[in-house]
Amino acid sequence: MYVIVVDFDIRPDRLAAFLPLMQENAAASVRDEPGCHQFDVCQDPDAPHRIFLYELYDDRAAFEAHLASPHFRSFDAASADMITSKHVRALHRL
C-alpha cells in the first residue's frame, strides 16, 4: 500500500473556510476513487491551524489519479491562498 502523509499550516483567519473544503475532498476521494482506501483529516488540538492528513492508496498510480481528479483540482485551487506551508511525504506500508 502507498501512504501519503501531509502536514499543513493554515492561515488562522481562513481555517473555518479550509476545513469544509478539505473534508469534502477527503470524502470524495474515498467515495469516487477506487484506489483510495482511507483519507483521514486530523487537527492538532494545541494548534488548530495545523492539519495532518493520512491517505492510503493501492499504489503510486492511484495517488497520481487522485491528483488528477476533478475534486482534488477544485480543492487545490480553492484552498491555495489559505495554506501557509505544506509538507508531503510518500511512504510504503509494511
Regions found by a protein language model. Give the residues of each.
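Short phosphate-engaging motifs
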Residues: 14, 59, 71
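Short amphipathic alpha-helical segments
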Residues: 14-37
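Generic structural signal for individual residues within well-ordered alpha-helical segments
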Residues: 16-19, 64, 73
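Glycine-rich beta-strand-turn "strand-cap" elements at beta-sheet edges
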Residues: 40-49, 75-94
